[in-house]
């Protein structure tokens, strides 16, 4: 029995859900988001994989059309205007812009108290100071704190 040693196989490297499905989109992240949203009581193991595949297909399709739009306009960098123009030209993808318009119309601003409005005004003033003063921001903030 002394000659019988346990044979250990080398462990295979773990593969992520995305890699197993040969997708670029993060399947595990989508699964976590779906579980946290609690829209459904039970979630199939293939649901996030399918959703990642659909999102990847849509993204690739949109980027292909946007790339053609950028090439036609003789530019090197993709801007939001290029994306919007490409979506407007494609009849099948135009619904994405309609979704965007619906979400903007449904969003309403929350009523704010006077304190929250003052805090927001201070933040806006600080942003102006940041833009104007550039690298001297820290010194300026310290002086204000000492004075008050």
Swiss-Prot record:
GO aspect biological process, one term: heterochromatin formation
Superkingdom per UniProt: Eukaryota
GO cellular component: nucleosome; nucleus
Composition skew (Acidic residues), residue ranges: 111-127
Major localization listed first in the record, in broad terms: nucleus
SUPFAM superfamilies xref list: Histone-fold
Compartments reported by the entry: Nucleus; Chromosome
Molecular function (Gene Ontology), one example: protein heterodimerization activity
Region of interest: Disordered: 101-128
Sorted UniProt keywords: Chromosome, DNA-binding, Nucleosome core, Nucleus
Subunit structure: The nucleosome is a histone octamer containing two molecules each of H2A, H2B, H3 and H4 assembled in one H3-H4 heterotetramer and two H2A-H2B heterodimers. The octamer wraps approximately 147 bp of DNA.
Function: Core component of nucleosome. Nucleosomes wrap and compact DNA into chromatin, limiting DNA accessibility to the cellular machineries which require DNA as a template. Histones thereby play a central role in transcription regulation, DNA repair, DNA replication and chromosomal stability. DNA accessibility is regulated via a complex set of post-translational modifications of histones, also called histone code, and nucleosome remodeling.
PANTHER family: HISTONE H2A
Family listed: Belongs to the histone H2A family.
Protein name in UniProt: Histone H2A-like 3
Organism: Homo sapiens (Human)
């Amino acid at each position: 029995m002394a000659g019988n040693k346990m044979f250990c196989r080398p462990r295979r490297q773990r593969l992520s859900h995305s890699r197993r499905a040969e997708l670029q989109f993060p399947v595990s992240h989508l699964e976590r988001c779906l579980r946290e949203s609690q829209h459904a009581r039970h979630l199939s193991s293939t649901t996030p994989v399918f959703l990642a595949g659909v999102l990847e297909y849509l993204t690739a399709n949109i980027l292909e059309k946007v790339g053609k739009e950028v090439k036609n306009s003789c530019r090197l960098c993709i801007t939001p205007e290029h994306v919007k123009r490409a979506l407007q030209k494609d009849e099948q993808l135009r619904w994405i812009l309609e979704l965007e318009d619906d979400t903007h119309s449904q969003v309403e601003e929350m009523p704010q108290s006077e304190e929250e409005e003052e805090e927001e005004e201070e933040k806006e003033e600080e942003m102006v100071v940041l833009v104007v003063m550039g690298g001297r921001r820290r010194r300026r903030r310290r002086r204000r704190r000492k004075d008050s």
